[in-house]
């Protein structure tokens, strides 16, 4: 089975997905680039093809409307894109955090590449942290990710990680998704993205105010079942009823005391606990071919969408 993860680096404890090279704290950006497998560039070349006929070998022709992107180190192709496609280099993802780590107190915690270099990301802790009742701690992060295969715009996203279980949840505030997305048809301006994202205490405080509200909202069994039905509705339309029932039963078991931190006062019998049962299922329990497939889904794919839906439905309970 080929792995999605090409290379990755992290500090502190082994990440929940169990992948990567461990670094010491406060390593320079240059060390991160090497250890995270991000010390290469994305190169461009014309799309070429061989014309052939029965009488000859033909000749090399080009297709001017598109270009091939490939790695500078291995020369492996990454994708074919239009000429309008604006490349974001691996170094730009890490450089985004240079002033944040050197001046603003951020600390890089993980960075790496997926799918042979098609997806690139870095995650840094902001230094913001909040505690709900029962000593339930969540820390604030900013995730920056991009893809050169057309599957992901360059995205800067506020993210929270609950310490007791390492569940990840994208921060969303009202009409704002807590994210800034830059299409590859436009150039990536790191400083403009930071200004638009509004890396500030108020964003984190507003999010944790919502989480506090969820932790104080007690839920009854029928409410929990209705919530899970709404969250998993699109998934349960596909596949067998048995698979749907197993998913719901697994998440309900996590909520009902079997999940990490499920017995904390903030989570036991509350909407916050119900939300975290879904995020734990996506991050840790949901079936995946490999841990790197799980990471890909939880941060960028179907799992991320499922967690977003779970948050939306949870907030309805306290609206």
Predicted segments with their positions:
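Ser/Thr-rich, low-complexity intrinsically disordered terminal regions
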Residues: 102-132, 233, 252
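A short, surface-exposed helix-loop junction/capping segment
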Residues: 59-84
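Intrinsically disordered, low-complexity regions enriched in serine/threonine
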Residues: 1-55, 127-319
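Generic structural hydrophobic/aromatic packing signal, biased to beta-strands
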Residues: 69, 122-124, 144
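Short, well-ordered loop/turn elements at secondary-structure boundaries
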Residues: 64, 117-118, 138
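Amphipathic alpha-helical segments
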Residues: 83-107
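Short N-terminal secondary-structure initiator segments
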Residues: 1-12, 97, 108, 113-121
